[in-house]
């Protein structure tokens, strides 16, 4: 598997729009990028089944497995967006408290992460809500039922999933280098926005 990864890195990847969305659609889970699994649908279906049956069940004694799968899908539809717990809960038909618990499970098991808003005492008009991201965009594309990169690039979430991909890659690059990454986003009430703000050594 390592040799396949090295060969892939040496070949390089396309950097045009088609190539980027191919990477987004494929995702970055080891089983996919190593070439061990050749059928993407089978891989992600198996991954989700194993994740819910094993990992989630280890964290909570009882859970509505089908409801939880629907919940992950509803969250995936909102990747790269401001977190709205009530909207996700409404889509799935669960309470806001249940939605908060299930988001906690997804965060604890490294399926999702949040970008907190950047703020200081001089910035009074900033939005306070975090933004929701998935670590793997291939999972997002699978959950939202995009059957190819070509369809995804013209889909309703094309901008949001591209942002998700960029933010996740930045975060993973810091993690892989063993570095802390203080990442934020900035948005004020006039809708002025910076997608990523990185704080290091007291500077932005």
Residue ranges and their predicted role:
Residues 33-203:
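Accessory nucleic acid-recognition modules appended to NTPase machines
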Residues 4-49:
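Amphipathic alpha-helical "lid/sensor" segments that cap RecA-like P-loop NTPase cores
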């Amino acid at each position: 598997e390592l040799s396949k990864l090295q060969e892939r890195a040496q070949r390089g990847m396309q950097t045009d729009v088609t190539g980027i969305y191919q990477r987004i659609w494929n995702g970055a889970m080891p089983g996919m990028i190593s070439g061990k699994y050749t059928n993407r649908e089978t891989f992600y279906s198996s991954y989700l089944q194993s994740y819910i049956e094993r990992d989630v069940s280890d964290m909570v004694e009882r859970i509505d497995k089908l409801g939880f799968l629907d919940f992950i899908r509803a969250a995936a539809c909102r990747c790269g967006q401001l977190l709205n717990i009530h909207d996700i809960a409404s889509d799935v038909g669960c309470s806001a408290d249940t939605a908060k618990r299930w988001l906690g499970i997804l965060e604890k098991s490294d399926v999702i992460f949040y970008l907190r808003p950047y703020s200081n005492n001089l910035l009074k008009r900033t939005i306070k809500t975090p933004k929701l991201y998935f670590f793997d965009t291939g999972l997002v594309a699978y959950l939202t039922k995009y059957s190819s990169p070509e369809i995804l690039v013209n889909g309703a979430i094309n901008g949001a999933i591209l942002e998700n991909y960029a933010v996740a890659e930045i975060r993973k690059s810091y993690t892989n280098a063993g570095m802390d990454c203080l990442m934020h986003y900035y948005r004020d009430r006039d809708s002025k926005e910076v997608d990523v703000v990185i704080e290091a050594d007291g500077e932005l």
